[in-house]
Structure formats: structure tokens, C-alpha cells
């Protein structure tokens, strides 16, 4: 048995969906701004949540990183809020973290300004004068 069998057809598809969901979030933000008569390149966007899951300060393998990188490539100004994260090393030290030449930055344009990114702990300060909010882990109330 292998990937040629019908049993495992869903596995590569699931991996593809998981790998591209962050890019889809950036596209949804772009589309929402467009519907409001705004363009990404002239917008300030708040990202709520930098870590890979709720209530932790670990940003390794965070889907939010790709959202930030794609929106930055589109020209957006990004402000970041996460009460558990003090530094987002993948952005701040992108030339050397996790290792030289291994940053996601190499796949996106206009990433230089992300080195000056600061994670804000004060939600009110983060939301001041933003055009949109990207909250990757948001759920709709039931």
C-alpha cells in the first residue's frame, strides 16, 4: 500500500490545505478591505495572536507568521498583539532565525520592515487607528 492506493488520497490534500490556509486568510483580509473601498497597501492591520495556539508564547510554526508575511508583501502595515509573546524572533531576527537562510522571509517580498516588528501587550493600543483586524483563531459565537 502506498500513495497510489485510494486509501491515502486524502492525506496529501489535507497537507496542502493546512499549508495554504494562512495565505487564504491574507486573501480574505485583502478582499474584506476591498469591499470596504480600501486597499491593502494603504491599510494598517492588527493581527491578534502571534503564537501557534492559544495561551502560549511560542511562535514557532505559527500560521500567523505567513499571514503577516503575505499582508506585508501586499504592502500593509501590520501591528501585532499577543499577551503571551514578548518577541517574535521569526520576524525580528529573520536573517538568522531559526538559522541563516532558513527564514520564511526568503519566499516573500518587502520583508525588511518586519525586523522592526514589536508585539504589543496592550490590546487598546494595538487597535488604535487600524483599518482591519486579522484574528486567525477567531471563532464565531454559538
Residue ranges with predicted function:
Residues 1-142:
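Structural/interface elements that position substrates and couple domains in central-metabolism enzymes
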Amino acid at each position: 500500500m502506498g500513495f497510489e492506493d485510494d486509501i491515502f488520497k486524502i492525506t496529501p490534500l489535507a497537507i496542502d490545505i493546512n499549508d495554504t490556509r494562512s495565505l487564504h486568510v491574507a486573501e480574505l483580509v485583502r478582499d474584506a478591505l476591498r469591499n470596504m473601498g480600501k486597499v491593502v497597501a494603504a491599510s494598517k492591520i492588527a493581527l491578534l495572536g502571534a503564537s501557534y495556539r492559544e495561551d502560549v508564547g511560542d511562535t514557532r510554526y505559527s500560521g500567523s507568521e505567513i499571514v503577516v508575511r503575505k499582508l506585508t508583501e501586499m504592502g500593509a502595515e501590520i501591528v501585532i498583539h499577543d499577551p503571551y509573546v514578548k518577541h517574535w524572533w521569526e520576524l525580528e531576527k529573520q536573517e538568522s532565525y531559526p538559522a541563516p537562510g532558513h527564514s520564511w522571509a526568503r519566499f516573500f517580498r518587502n520583508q525588511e520592515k518586519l525586523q522592526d516588528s514589536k508585539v504589543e501587550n496592550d490590546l487598546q493600543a494595538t487597535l488604535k487607528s487600524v483599518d482591519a483586524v486579522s484574528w486567525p483563531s477567531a471563532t464565531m459565537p454559538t
